[in-house]
């Protein structure tokens, strides 16, 4: 099956149009945490895609466990296993500790998972021709809020390094769904659905279009943006995007390290002066 982002977005939008009001048992006039609404909406998107793409839609940890079962059935050994190619593996591999207990303990879902949902082009799963890694974000139209954390910039730089240094053509896409909702009674109504491709967002001020992709170095080095507010103007290949992102990442990292080293030098000089005057060290 050929997967197209527009078709996936359309399936989700039509689902919410038909769904209408979603009762979440919210208490009236009470502030609710983002997760109180965001988590049920993630489940709604999962339901929408499961109906549109049956047998090809998984939560990330479900996809890993199904793939491991598939490899065992084929007589392959999952120990130290690579999920698909090395690039995809760097995004989804749960680590040696989680795999060492499999199958006695299945791979669990984690908050740090790259994707809420994984959509495959065919039943070969990670060995197939296309892997959609989909993360769901949501925001209340009635509130002003900061752009959410999207993913670790360090993780993204690592997958860029793998693809570029080993000449691996990405068979994966990083998609972000933004659900704009309004509260109503004890629930919400999703009024807007926007789906964007990470590798169509200009990582730098590319060709005079857009702004540099923002990396918050103070918040666990996270790429941050609101999916409904970014441009999709990057027109080169995925490999080109990864190269430009690496340029953005390394430039910002170099500037930050230089600043930290400069501050450290000033602090060490200050400490040395204090030590000489106080004679207590």
Give a label for each model feature.
Residues 1-113, 119-132, 138-281:
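Nucleic-acid endonuclease domains
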């Amino acid at each position: 099956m050929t997967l197209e982002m527009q078709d996936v977005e359309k399936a989700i939008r039509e689902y919410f149009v038909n769904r209408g009001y979603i009762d979440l048992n919210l208490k009236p006039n009470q502030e609710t945490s983002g997760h109180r609404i965001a988590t049920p909406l993630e489940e709604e998107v999962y339901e929408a895609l499961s109906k549109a793409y049956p047998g090809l839609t998984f939560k990330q940890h479900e996809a890993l466990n199904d793939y491991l079962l598939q490899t065992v059935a084929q007589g392959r050994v999952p120990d130290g296993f690579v999920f698909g190619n090395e690039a995809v593996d760097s995004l989804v591999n749960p680590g040696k500790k989680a795999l060492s207990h499999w199958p006695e303990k299945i791979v669990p879902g984690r908050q740090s998972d790259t994707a809420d949902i994984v959509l495959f082009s065919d039943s070969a799963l990670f060995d197939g021709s296309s892997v959609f890694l989909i993360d769901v974000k949501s925001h209340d139209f009635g509130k002003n809020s900061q752009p959410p954390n999207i993913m670790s910039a360090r993780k993204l730089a690592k997958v860029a390094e793998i693809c570029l240094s080993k000449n691996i053509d990405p068979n994966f896409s990083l998609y972000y769904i933004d659900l704009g909702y309004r509260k109503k009674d004890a629930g919400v109504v999703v009024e807007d659905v926007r789906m964007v491709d990470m590798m169509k967002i200009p990582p730098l001020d590319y060709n005079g279009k857009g702004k540099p992709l923002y990396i918050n170095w103070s918040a666990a080095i996270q790429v941050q943006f609101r999916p409904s507010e970014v441009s999709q103007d990057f027109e080169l290949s995925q490999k080109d995007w990864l190269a430009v992102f690496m340029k953005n990442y390394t430039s910002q990292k170099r500037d930050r390290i230089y600043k930290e080293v400069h501050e450290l030098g000033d602090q060490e000089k200050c400490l040395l002066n204090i030590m000489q005057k106080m004679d207590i060290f």
